Amino acid sequence: MKVIVSENAQQLGKKAAELTAQYLREAIAEKGSARIILSTGASQFTTLEALVKEDVDWSKVEMFHLDEYVNLPQDHPASFVRYLKERFVEKTGGLKAVHFVDTSIGTDAIIEKLTGELKEAVVDVGLIGIGENAHVAFNDPPADFENQASYIVVQLDADCRKQQLGEGWFPTIDDVPRQAVSMTVSQILK
């Protein structure tokens, strides 16, 4: 593992974007396409802003979405689908494929759909942060590292919900959803 220390968020985001673009270009050169998993949250702002400016043939990149609240409309300011559309998808000029966690079709249906799509090929790179309470995606501590499913429905704990409130995504704690569909730890580690 290589640790990179940066002076600020802009510098860190730019470096993360450069490395990610390099991995994507290498995968495209080797296999003809690349697959990326994207997460959301304030920690990704500078990285995604810099990544869409990188020299990558986005038409050969398939994007997977890490997690999404259950029953939150996609036009809600806190929707991760909206976040990724506005900050990434719409700025790439067109991706090979986009696999959103669209909970509007039902949790069982989206989990089955995404699981099938994930199994088609290896994911080349993931941009995944760690939350204030040490959650990865919506796998709050103590997460189940043994669950071999690709995606699951999770109950959001109080600390996770407080983080979402604190970041300004929701006006009150009661507005923060209590469930989400999340990629599992075992899938993230693949």
What kind of region is each of these model predictions?
Residues T40, I188-K190:
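Short, intrinsically disordered, charge-balanced linker/junction segments flanking boundaries
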Residues M1-I36, D108:
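N-terminal glycine-/serine-/threonine-rich phosphate-binding loop
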Residues A17-R25, V52, K85-V89, T115-K119, ...:
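Generic structural signal for well-ordered alpha-helical scaffold segments
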Residues A121-E146:
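Glycine-rich phosphate-binding loop
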Residues L51-E54, P77-F80, K113-L114, V136, ...:
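Short, glycine/charged-enriched secondary-structure capping and boundary segments
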Residues A137-V185:
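Class I SAM-dependent methyltransferase SAM-binding "motif I" and its flanking Rossmann-like core
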Residues R25-E54:
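Glycine-rich N-terminal segment of FAD-binding domains in flavoprotein oxidoreductases
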